[in-house]
Amino acid sequence: MKNKKWIAMLLTAAMAVTLLAGCGGGNDAASSSAAAEGSASSESSNVVVVGTNPTFAPFEYQDDEGNMTGFDLDLMEAIAADQGFEVEFKSMEFDALIGALTTGQIDAVAAGMSFDPKRNNVLFSDPYMDASLGIMVAADSDIASADDLQGKTVAAQIGTTGADEATALEEAGTATAKLLDNYNTCVQDLLTGGCDAIIIDIPVAQAYLKDHADEVKLTGEPYASDYYGIVVDEDNQELLDKINAGLANVIENGKFDELCAKYELDVPESVKDGSAKDAVAEIMSAAE
């Protein structure tokens, strides 16, 4: 495999995520003592502890020095600066984030987390990214659309909406679902022939494709609509209000567009014009 920018980030994140989970991560903030019993932060500290999973470039990953970085972290920093609080980031496994949030180990989650009515006891911010799901396959694959997944093995990251879609395919007798720990592992599994396709967030796939179009490709139309939000505990409406206010200001003052450009992401017009909120309301109404 070619040693290029994004694969270096992916492999670095894959090797280091276990270490990060154990020691608090490359970012000094990850080892903050603010994560106290019953509440990750206190009113007097003015610090919000944010859980993330740095295996998801360009939204959260590790740089060449092992520090956590990415669009979500920069966005959270911008929101915090606008609203007058500080943030500290804590690395953990993706499927442990909601549990950590509801037990007070962290105050918020910024980890490319999709709006999902099955996520209980939490509140989502307004959407900040249109991240529809797509199908990634090997560059020489003859899979051209979802219709071609019959009898195939389809991978996805455990705990994600992609995993829900893969599981639904298996339950329908269409394909075999293979749920793996993170997207890096899914990509490696695809490249080594362990699966035939990945259901993956399109912006993440596009970031990988920039340097690896000779290895993989996105195929067919977007598989399903998906949006990201920042997540807080259901009892923390005050923090949610600050996050939403800060997000609106960051979008309005142009900082949001700057961050999209920095991480080579398409500016999500549905977020800027408000139509993403309507789409999310429809998604979340499925729980009612």
Regions found by a protein language model. Name each.
Residues P54, D130-V137, I202, Q206, ...:
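Periplasmic-binding protein-like
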Residues G25, D164-L180, K217-T219, A248-E288:
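Ligand-binding clefts/hinges and TM-proximal coupling segments of bilobed small-molecule sensing domains
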